[in-house]
């Protein structure tokens, strides 16, 4: 899986789960925890409000919704 696909999948996973650890994410995506930290930072830099609780995991801040995406035929 390339990085773009993984970051989008990570966002969707965070959207469907309450809390998830970096370790479980690294196991799920078969990458290092360091890679997960970089992917989380990428999402945060894109404006996604990700919260973190030490020893508990990552989560999307309450009330965040994925923005709608529109495609054209062009």
Predicted regions and their residues:
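Short, basic/aromatic recognition patches that contact phosphate-bearing ligands
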Residues: 1-74
